[in-house]
Design a protein with these regions (language model features):
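Generic cytosolic/nucleocytoplasmic N-terminal low-complexity/intrinsically disordered segments
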Residues: 1-2, 98
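Hydrophobic h-region of N-terminal signal peptides that target proteins for export
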Residues: 10-18
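Sec-dependent signal peptide recognition
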Residues: 2-8
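Beta-rich carbohydrate-recognition modules and glycan-binding surfaces
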Residues: 18-197
Length: 197
């Protein structure tokens, strides 16, 4: 009986600790409405793409696919969520109201699979929102199998000058998953976004 009780306590402690050490945002039918597709066509580019919510067995994921083309100063398609005075998706509600210090969040984990291409995370914070220097970016690689990609915040660089970024997760204003920067076919699946301590 003591062994069973000890095992239960160990399992409970492990689950509680895991939950306390990260903020996880799986893609679902309910929260996918918080995300939007954008392409370089908003600035005269000719890249084309779309997003769809799909399922692979028990795994629900969002898929970003299309053709990235760099003509006309373009070169991106992206899946993005953002917060505003009139809209605050659950991702930002939990980040901004976290009882832990957002500055102690260490980075991002994504559960992804793709077509072997390199993709990007674009982040804007309240400090640099809507400024030309405002995007902080990091890259990750993909494979045809599901895998967890870990991107520490200290890997992010400023898009304009390539300097190191200092990101406090509680200051994040926009978060984008982006196919960017060269001519290629995008096909990326993401089942969850997680911020870890």
């Amino acid at each position: 009986m003591k062994k069973i009780l000890s095992l239960f306590i160990l399992i409970f402690t492990t689950i509680t600790s895991a939950g306390a050490d990260s903020l996880s945002f799986p893609f679902t039918q309910d929260n996918v409405k918080d995300w939007r597709f954008f392409s370089d066509q908003v600035m005269g580019g000719i890249s084309e793409g779309q997003v769809s919510l799909e399922q692979d067995g028990d795994k629900v994921f969002i898929r970003l696919y299309g053709d990235v083309r760099t003509e006309n100063n373009g070169g991106f398609i992206q899946l993005r969520t953002s917060t505003s005075l009139s809209n605050k998706p659950s991702l930002f509600k939990r980040l901004h109201s976290s009882k832990k210090d957002g500055g102690k969040l260490q980075g991002i984990r994504l559960k992804v699979k793709g077509n072997g291409e390199k993709y990007h995370i674009f982040i804007q914070t309240t400090i640099f929102y809507r400024l030309p220097t405002g995007y902080q970016i990091a890259t990750f690689n993909t494979s045809p199998e599901w895998e967890t990609v870990e991107i520490p915040f200290n890997r992010f660089k400023n898009l304009k000058d390539n300097k190191d970024s200092k990101i406090n997760a509680q200051d994040i204003k926009t978060f984008g998953i982006v196919a960017y920067g060269r001519d290629f076919k995008s096909d990326l699946a993401v089942s969850s976004v997680e911020f870890y301590y």
